[in-house]
Amino acid sequence: MYLELVKKNSVILDKDGNKVKEVELPFIFSFPVRKDIIRRVFLAEFTHSLQPKGRDPMAGKRTSAESFGINLGMARVPRVKNSGEAALAPNTVGGRLTFPPSVDKKLVEEVNDKEKQLAVISALSATADKVFVKARGHVFKDSVSFPIVVTDDIVSLKTASEVEEFLEKIGVYDDVKRVKERIRIRAGKGKMRGRKYKESIGPLIIVHDSNSPIVKAARNIAGVDVVNAKDVSVIHLAPGAHSGRLTIYTETSIKILDERLSKRLVS
């Protein structure tokens, strides 16, 4: 089965939101959106962030308790000598767990390399479709065209206020406002464990240089993430396995993504 893909065109904007030129996009932005593959790969990659946990094999067993035996008119649970206090058994205070978690459990789910690359291509394609971006809940001006491609000089932005001003000029700052308004206190014990607030997902900026000033400038803006094109994955493009994240690309990052992923469309 062969797919006939048609290349899309995109407008390139400068820091002030003005149209600079129009370019032809690579085929990776024309691929059909496969939600099933995106979800499968997202869940597999998410397992890499899980921390193995287990219990001390001797937990609850550090006692000399033994059962007193039968025909005494009492339960046959192990009991501490000279006190008769039940111990060791799973149904006793301070006893062992019945089936404790084991560090040997395999937490990381593996996925085929081809499938992983296909998921990234599919997620990239969703970011180029206004319908998918809108359906995900992002807010932006009607004049915004997708995908959003900007000139490389935006990576030189040094302060958060400059980045916010840039987002306002290209018409996506309303999405940052949406995230700020929806920051809320988490339910449950996570509040005690350094996760007091829950924050929604906002715009993603894909750059070509991890050491550029914009990486630090944007990290304190609510919901905004900055990622190198070499490292971008389904985790960034489709958080929660929901495709269509509002994404901003630099001109060079498009070329890096094309070099990295176009071979998969040919093979």
From Swiss-Prot:
Name of the protein: Large ribosomal subunit protein uL4
SUPFAM superfamilies: Ribosomal protein L4
GO terms of molecular function: rRNA binding; structural constituent of ribosome
Transmembrane segments: none
InterPro entries tied to this protein: Ribosomal_uL4 (IPR002136), Ribosomal_uL4_dom_sf (IPR023574), Ribosomal_uL4_euk/arc_CS (IPR013000), Ribosomal_uL4_euk/arch (IPR045240), Ribosomall_uL4-arc (IPR019970)
Keywords, alphabetical: Ribonucleoprotein, Ribosomal protein, RNA-binding, rRNA-binding
Coiled coil: none
GO biological process: translation
Species of origin: Saccharolobus islandicus (strain Y.G.57.14 / Yellowstone #1) (Sulfolobus islandicus)
GO CC annotation: ribonucleoprotein complex; ribosome
Gene: rpl4
NCBIfam families, alphabetized: rpl4p_arch
Subunit structure: Part of the 50S ribosomal subunit.
Functional description taken from the UniProt entry: One of the primary rRNA binding proteins, this protein initially binds near the 5'-end of the 23S rRNA. It is important during the early stages of 50S assembly. It makes multiple contacts with different domains of the 23S rRNA in the assembled 50S subunit and ribosome.
Family recorded in the similarity comment: Belongs to the universal ribosomal protein uL4 family.
